Amino acid sequence: VNGGIYHAPTLLKDNQARDSHRVISFNTSKQMRKLLRGVVTDGSGKRANVLGYEVAGKTGTANKLVNGHYVDKKVMTSFLATFPASEPQYALFMVMDEPKPLKETWGFVTSGWNTVPTAGKIISEIAPQLNVKANYDLDELRRSRIIEATFEKPVRP
């Protein structure tokens, strides 16, 4: 999503010894960024949509193998996010091992109900600390629950 350039991951800021090279075309990267943003604006990653920070991401839910058989309610969920989607600077990868079904999730244990909202909360807290400039474009504001909610037509949380 960064234009198609691989950068060796590091925990060090301004690490000069990074291995960088092109792995996919710029246009393919741009298209993937658009698709991954759609996961958060219109798909199973909606609960990670942090107004102003253009989160993009991919959800994942995998049934666990127990005694040679996949078990429906034993899953690992994941969410790989990047932000801001227009110019990705940060990535966040979350995994939950066997999340429990809750009343609030109507018993669902897929990524969109547990890993995704947790990632959204983390991003909403760390983005300002990382000095990521919020971008409240008009289209995002129109789609947001803030503008949709009115006294005549309240929006459920």
Outline where the language-model segments fall.
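Conserved active-site-proximal loop/helix segments of enzymes involved in bacterial cell-wall
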Residues: 1-50, 101-112, 129-153
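Residue-level preference for non-acidic, small/hydrophobic
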Residues: 32, 58-60, 80, 92, ...
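Solvent-exposed loop/turn segments at secondary-structure junctions
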Residues: 39, 61-63, 85-86, 96-101
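Short, Gly/Ser/Thr-enriched beta-strand-loop segments that form substrate-interacting elements
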Residues: 51-84
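Extracellular/periplasmic catalytic domains that process cell-envelope and extracellular macromolecules
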Residues: 71-74, 82-88, 145-146, 154-155
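Short, well-ordered beta-strand elements
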Residues: 80, 88-107
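C-terminal, active-site-flanking charged/polar segments
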Residues: 86, 112-129
